[in-house]
């Protein structure tokens, strides 16, 4: 792994941690309970994809859109705070994406449980 890639990986992990902490301090109700699941950053540190999810899941598309709009509205403040906490010369542009993986996993588990419960009832 080259030094540039290693640095990008380290910065991405630190950015994930810092954003997680900074988001807890924001008072916007649209982003209450948001969790940062991962951050992907370009090698030149110019742009970061921030993958987020809701603590309790966001089943409907409207809730996801509201969450992402709240994050977009806060992105300027978050970039300023990241610049202060991380001490980077170049602060990446933050782009937010909803991470549907945990919600899909939870839904699959529910469906499997329903199937299991349904097949148990048929045997009785």
UniProtKB/Swiss-Prot annotation:
Keyword Cytoplasm: yes
Localisation: Cytoplasm
GO terms of biological process kind: maturation of SSU-rRNA
Gene3D superfamilies found in the cross-reference section: 3.30.300.20
GO molecular-function term, one example from the UniProt record: ribosomal small subunit binding
Keywords: Cytoplasm, Ribosome biogenesis
Pfam families: RBFA
One GO location term (cellular component): cytosol
SUPFAM superfamilies reported for this sequence: Ribosome-binding factor A, RbfA
Oligomer and partners: Monomer. Binds 30S ribosomal subunits, but not 50S ribosomal subunits or 70S ribosomes.
Function noted in UniProt: One of several proteins that assist in the late maturation steps of the functional core of the 30S ribosomal subunit. Associates with free 30S ribosomal subunits (but not with 30S subunits that are part of 70S ribosomes or polysomes). Required for efficient processing of 16S rRNA. May interact with the 5'-terminal helix region of 16S rRNA.
Family: Belongs to the RbfA family.
Protein name in the entry: Ribosome-binding factor A
Organism annotation: Sorangium cellulosum (strain So ce56) (Polyangium cellulosum (strain So ce56))
Organism lineage: Bacteria, Pseudomonadati, Myxococcota, Polyangia, Polyangiales
């Amino acid at each position: 792994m080259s030094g540039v890639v290693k640095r990008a990986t380290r910065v991405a992990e630190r950015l994930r941690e810092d954003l997680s902490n900074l988001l807890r301090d924001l008072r916007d109700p649209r982003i209450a309970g948001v969790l940062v699941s991962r951050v992907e950053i370009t090698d030149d540190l110019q742009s970061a994809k921030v993958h987020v999810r809701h603590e309790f899941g966001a089943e409907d598309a409207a809730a996801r859109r509201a969450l992402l709009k709240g994050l977009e509205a806060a992105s300027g403040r978050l970039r300023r705070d990241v610049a202060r906490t991380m001490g980077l010369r170049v602060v990446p542009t933050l782009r937010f994406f909803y991470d549907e993986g945990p919600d899909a996993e939870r839904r699959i588990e529910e469906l499997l449980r329903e199937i299991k419960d349904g097949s148990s009832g048929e045997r009785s």
